[in-house]
């Protein structure tokens, strides 16, 4: 008998890509997969592109909005729960999996009303508002990092599912770091870029010799960032708005400078690449700092808060590694050791156990 799951996730790649990893694994096991999302976020296009049917409900976030929207919020939430209720009653899934995003809240409530097991997965080290509320009614609570929720009989640390190309990368031997080789540095500020990385990192790298640089600048920033490198005399650099094959870029790099989204941290560990994390300072509940600390407290990465990052400080750190690349080798080993490479299988197993 074929089983059915509804995955509730959307808004950002940090929610959608782990959900897709689980979806593909369950589909390979013969499951029917449906998706619940919102029509104006990235899941609307990305999920169908992966071959999964998607249903939409109308719901928006409540943070940082005006009084009128907050006053209307109870009515909008009730409407969204009703929409989700009707969709789930029609699909009749055996279990629902909430991976975060606006649709997960109403979807989880509707599933609970219908008596459908609710599995919750929190990718970040600090749980988001939707998941904190859903945790009260969830059948099972899964965590990417320890500390997002208290460990109880309902909760488990399972890690964050990553894309297959990163799992393949994790099977390859770690790089060997040697003095004298050009240090290959990858800068990733997210798909929309990160202004401090675009502005400060070029000044830091201009103070170094024997480097090769690839820099993802974000949409509309490539020309300005490229011009900045050129004005600073850095010639061994390639600047692009967006890197389509991130796993290949990680495999190329000796060192990564990036933000600390949950998916990024999981992919860094799987790849076994030394990273300097510069957490987004205004992330909700400072969750990026806590994500980064899952590696930095093990010595498996370096944390550099944005307010403390200067060109001189970053250049000095990298120069130390150029003199003694054994430090990078040790960080790479600790990073790979921290990876939970079977996270997708763990999530799948927890979902199957509830049927």
UniProtKB/Swiss-Prot annotation:
UDP-N-acetyl-alpha-D-glucosamine binds at residues 12-14, 124, 163, 191, 243, 262-267, 288. The keyword Flavoprotein does not apply. Its EC number is 2.4.1.227. It is found in: Cell inner membrane. Pathway: Cell wall biogenesis; peptidoglycan biosynthesis. It is a peripheral membrane protein. It comes from the Bacteria. NCBIfam families: murG. This is UDP-N-acetylglucosamine--N-acetylmuramyl-(pentapeptide) pyrophosphoryl-undecaprenol N-acetylglucosamine transferase. It comes from Tolumonas auensis (strain DSM 9187 / NBRC 110442 / TA 4). The lineage of its organism: Bacteria, Pseudomonadati, Pseudomonadota, Gammaproteobacteria, Aeromonadales. The gene is murG.
């Amino acid at each position: 008998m074929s089983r059915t799951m509804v995955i509730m996730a959307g808004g950002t790649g940090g929610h959608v890509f782990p959900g897709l990893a689980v979806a593909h694994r369950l589909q390979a096991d013969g499951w029917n997969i449906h998706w619940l999302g919102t029509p104006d976020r990235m899941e609307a296009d990305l999920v169908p592109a992966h071959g999964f049917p998607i249903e939409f409900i109308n719901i928006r976030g409540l943070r940082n909005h005006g009084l009128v929207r907050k006053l209307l919020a109870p009515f909008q939430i009730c409407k969204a729960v009703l929409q989700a209720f009707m969709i789930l009653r029609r699909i009749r899934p055996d279990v629902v999996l909430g991976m975060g995003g606006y649709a997960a809240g109403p979807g989880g409530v509707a599933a609970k009303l219908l008596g459908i097991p609710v599995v919750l997965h929190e990718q970040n080290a600090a749980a988001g508002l939707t998941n904190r509320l859903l945790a009260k009614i969830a059948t099972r609570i899964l965590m990417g990092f320890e500390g997002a929720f208290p460990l109880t009989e309902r909760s488990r640390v399972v890690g964050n599912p990553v894309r297959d190309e990163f799992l393949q990368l994790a099977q390859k031997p770690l790089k060997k770091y040697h003095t004298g080789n050009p240090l290959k540095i990858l800068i990733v500020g997210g798909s929309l870029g990160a202004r401090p990385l675009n502005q400060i990192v070029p000044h830091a790298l201009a103070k170094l010799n024997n480097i090769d640089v690839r820099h993802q600048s974000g949409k509309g920033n490539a020309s300005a960032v490229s011009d900045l490198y050129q004005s600073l005399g850095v010639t061994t650099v390639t600047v692009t708005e967006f890197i389509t094959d991130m796993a290949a870029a990680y495999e190329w790099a000796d060192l990564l400078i990036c933000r600390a989204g949950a998916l990024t941290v999981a992919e860094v560990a799987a790849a076994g690449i030394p990273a300097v994390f510069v957490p987004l300072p205004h992330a909700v509940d400072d969750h990026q700092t806590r994500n980064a600390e899952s590696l930095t407290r093990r010595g498996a990465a370096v944390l550099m808060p944005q307010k403390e990052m200067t060109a001189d400080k970053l250049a000095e750190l990298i120069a130390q590694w150029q003199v003694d690349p054994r430090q990078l080798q040790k960080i790479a080993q600790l990073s790979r050791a921290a990876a939970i490479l079977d996270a997708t299988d763990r999530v799948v197993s927890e979902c199957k156990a509830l049927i």
